[in-house]
Amino acid sequence: EYLAKKQGCFHIIGAKTLHNLKEFYICEGFATAATIYKALNKLVIMGVDAGNLSKIVETLKNKFENTPITLIADNDKKRELKGLSNVGVETAKEIQQRFSDIKVIIPKISDQEAGQGVSDFNDIFLNKGLDEVKKQLNFIDFHNKLNTFENPTKTISQKDITR
C-alpha cells in the first residue's frame, strides 16, 4: 500500500503544464509513459497504476472537457491465460464506457509473449524495438479513427484488429 496520496495524482512527460495542449495520452507506469513519449514525441501522462486512471480521466475531462484523450492500456494477458482478470484491458474498457469519447489503445501481445511477461508498450520496446511500438500505435490508432468514422457508436476491440 502507498504511504503517500496517489488517487488522482500523475506525472507528466514531455511538457511542464497541461494547458494549451491539443490531446492527452495516458498510461499506467513510468517506463510505458517514457516509451510512448519516445515513440510519439507527444506529452504522456503517467497514472501510476490501473486503479488510478479513472480518477485522472475524470479530472482531465472536468478541467479540459474538449481536449481529446487516448488511454494506452496495459495488456495483462498473462493473468488472463491463468484464468484471472486482465486488469489493464478491463480497466480501460470500463473507463471508455464511462467516458465514451476517449480512445483506447491496447498493445497486441501473443500468448507466447504474455508467458514471457510482456504486458505493455515498454515491454514491446525492450523485446522488439521502438519501430514495433510505433507500428502498433499507428496501426491501432488508424483503425480506431476508421472505425469511428464508419460507425461512431461501436468500440473497437483487440479482437477486431487483424494484420
Where do the model's predicted regions map?
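Catalytic-loop motifs flanking and including active-site residues across diverse enzymes
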Residues: 32
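Glycine-/acidic-rich phosphate or pyrophosphate-binding loops and their flanking alpha/beta elements
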Residues: 1-21
